[in-house]
Amino acid sequence: MTDYKATLNLPDTAFPMKAGLPQREPQILQRWDSIGLYQKLREIGKDRPKFVLHDGPPYANGKIHIGHALNKILKDMIVRSKTLAGFDAPYVPGWDCHGLPIEHKVEVTHGKHLSADRTRELCREYAAEQIEGQKTEFIRLGVLGDWDNPYKTMNFANEAGEIRALAEMVKQGFVFKGLKPVNWCFDCGSALAEAEVEYADKKSQTIDVAFPVADEAKLAAAFGLASLTKPAAIVIWTTTPWTIPANQALNIHPEFKYALVDTGERLLVLAEELVESCLKRYNLEGSVVATAQGSALELINFRHPFYDRLSPIYLADYVELGAGTGVVHSSPAYGEDDFVTCKRYGMVNDDILTPVQSNGVYVESLPFFGGQFIWKANPAIVEKLSEVGALMHTETISHSYMHCWRHKTPLIYRATAQWFVGMDKQPSTGEPLRERALKAIEDTKFVPAWGQARLHAMIANRPDWCISRQRNWGVPIPFFLHKQTGELHPRTVELMEEVAKRVEQQGIEAWFKLDAAELLGAEADQYDKIADTLDVWFDSGTTHWHVLRGSHDIGHATGPRADLYLEGSDQHRGWFHSSLLTGCAIDNHAPYRELLTHGFTVDENGRKMSKSLGNTIEPEKVNNTLGADILRLWVSATDYSGEMAVSEQILQRSADAYRRIRNTARFLLSNLSGFDPARDLLASEDMLALDRWAVDRTLLLQRELEEHYSEYRFWNVYSKVHNFCVQELGGFYLDIIKDRQYTTGANSVARRSCQTALFHISEALVRWIAPILAFTADEIWQYLPGERNESVMLNGWYQGLSELPEGTELDRAYWDRVMAVKASVNKELENQRTAKVIGGNLQAEVTLYADEGLSADLGKLGDELRFVLITSAASVVPFAQAPAEAVATEVEGLKLKVVKSGHAKCGRCWHFRADVGSHPEHPEICSRCVDNLSGQGEVRHYA
């Protein structure tokens, strides 16, 4: 028996079937580094239009988690796809380096005894060490960027740039000093930004407290009475007993009705709607004597329960009827709404009582409670209220309360002298900041679109931005304040530039070591040099100034406006927010044209990731077991607009999908064996009809993919590429061409046509997957035939695809109909295999009973129909002649019948044909194979 295997064009490639990504990816990273891939991209892109994705800096602390990996991979997919689309898309990674978490780490490691200078020195060392660790992890994910020259907010140039950004805002009149309640953490000893606040359940003691009336006649008149017949009091309800010593007013709603209730011993003022629930809570019976509109009670004075001072009634719209008494006790130093209301009624800063110190302890001079920590003083305050007869009720409730994101301890609002960026303050020119920012939001594109309304609501309702902190590790606020007037030095902006120049050379230490006389000369003894540092959100929020037009100068020629900022949904109140405010203050527009928000990672059951639940996924572990490309494929396959589910099982599914794509690539490469595009590539018009369709289908898909990439719809890219590999290629085209590829002459038109199509498909596919499967695409690139440059990323989308000309007889619609017929035939062939009627598809002969239109279509393929259906014989018969046993199909006007071939099997092509053995020299093969071996070779026209 002759072995005809050597006469076949069998697939052959060195491209490995087994990916071995954990071992192979580091080798590819080394190659990218050795060829200077990022620098090469900058060189070839210098004359291209620019696309700037500005990196939101992760914090330089700890190992990266799955959220970091997701974020960086998304950014990398955009940068790579924009590069392929013909843009110069630089990517400068950055790090946020200052702030409390690093200072806290240093304190934990070295103790709190350190000097401020030593603290800063150790913080700088710690941040640098953390950056190196994170950088290695990000590079391992295949993220392409300027890793040798990232930006760091602690770089001297960036610290100086931040001071210059602040100077711009001072110059334009946005910055002011004020006393305002800010989020305060006793453990941090500092104000916190909104983004540093998280909410958790807390048990609090609630109290109902009676404030005796001081203006009895006015209260009587307000309720339409000649006089009061017995003692009267107004009742407040609060969850913060510790604020009672700082009470300075009582707030009621101007539109609510208030009742004067006779309870026997005294009269109580309560919101009419809450009388019943309050009396029940106090275990009292009573009757309403009179009612009055809230506005009628304005400015009536009541007495503090245990201090000799008055608390007037102020009207406030924020009072609610959901709980309590309808009366809110007001401590302007410890509540935002209280502060605003008291200021509206003319209270000046010097009149505001601030008995709580930065460590949470009352000042020693406070009667009854001096020297006590506020949380521990609560029982003593309740006892005092009970002692003076003011306590109506107390109970403990559990409610959501603000906590420090770092220490997990409860926060308070605390009025302190701080520096603010005014939201509604009139600048030297133009509109106030809030107005500017709201306009800028309208000019910004949001992905997903709901982000616009979210950010708009935050900006519309936010208070002034407190930018000062009382910490050591931060960029200084280099102000000199007059000792007598408290005013800024008249040359503040000029002095800030002098400080910035020094910081540029020596870092922030230059300010802290500066002797004021060096800048102020003889004036130095008249001014205080302040020690406050900037909110870290100001650090990252001004990177558009000190990175894009500063340390790295990667903005557009028209200015430092990025095309895209991309971060998690929490950054609407973080980096997106602070960047918007600084951009609008300095440049009067947002520093970005588009904002993309991604959701948070959850496990497959929708639960948040946490070490306690044991459901975290560590990027390093995935890299070392499955490979970074699997993680990248998961990112691409997941809709980032909501929560993103990830687990070991989900990643395993990504690995399965990866194998299908890799196997497709391997099939393409192995069937390009011996193909030299410079020698063997056919013109489109010389190719077979099916091959021309395959190239046309590839072109249509590429157009769709380019659009999906430009809109950042990576999950659509993934699904369409995966479906193309599995269905159009694996389930149709690649299956059909195997016979022609393997059995026809090595240099025949039939085979070269097929290889030309495979070459075009490969060139397109390798680029499609390059933004997602960064490592695998570059690996494939090395195995493609023909001369080529060093990396797929040094190219654009493939331009060698040709469209089917208009008027082509076998057009797209034609092949769609053929695919539908083939799917129906495959279904019946599978049934016959299951029933063991046939062993394989080539053992089948199929008769198609088709209506007139379909019959004409199928007839165009002639004898080549059998190659399309991958059966040994195929015939088309009029639909009316279908016998009873013919199988109906989902294709209208088509029935079919499959029978087992009665002919011998060709030992070379495996088709069952009547002419097997008809050639005496080759008794084991069919005449087609004989012709391909020793004759002119078969001629194919269609498939």
From Swiss-Prot:
Residues spanned by motif 'KMSKS' region: 608-612
GO terms for biological process, alphabetical: isoleucyl-tRNA aminoacylation
Binding site for L-isoleucyl-5'-AMP: 567
Record-listed ATP binding positions: 611
Cofactor: binding comment: Binds 1 zinc ion per subunit.
Keywords carried by this UniProt record: Aminoacyl-tRNA synthetase, ATP-binding, Cytoplasm, Ligase, Metal-binding, Nucleotide-binding, Protein biosynthesis, Zinc
Entry's EC annotation: 6.1.1.5
GO cellular component: cytosol
Function according to Swiss-Prot or TrEMBL: Catalyzes the attachment of isoleucine to tRNA(Ile). As IleRS can inadvertently accommodate and process structurally similar amino acids such as valine, to avoid such errors it has two additional distinct tRNA(Ile)-dependent editing activities. One activity is designated as 'pretransfer' editing and involves the hydrolysis of activated Val-AMP. The other activity is designated 'posttransfer' editing and involves deacylation of mischarged Val-tRNA(Ile).
Family of this protein: Belongs to the class-I aminoacyl-tRNA synthetase family. IleS type 1 subfamily.
Protein name: Isoleucine--tRNA ligase
Taxonomic placement: Bacteria, Pseudomonadati, Pseudomonadota, Gammaproteobacteria, Pseudomonadales
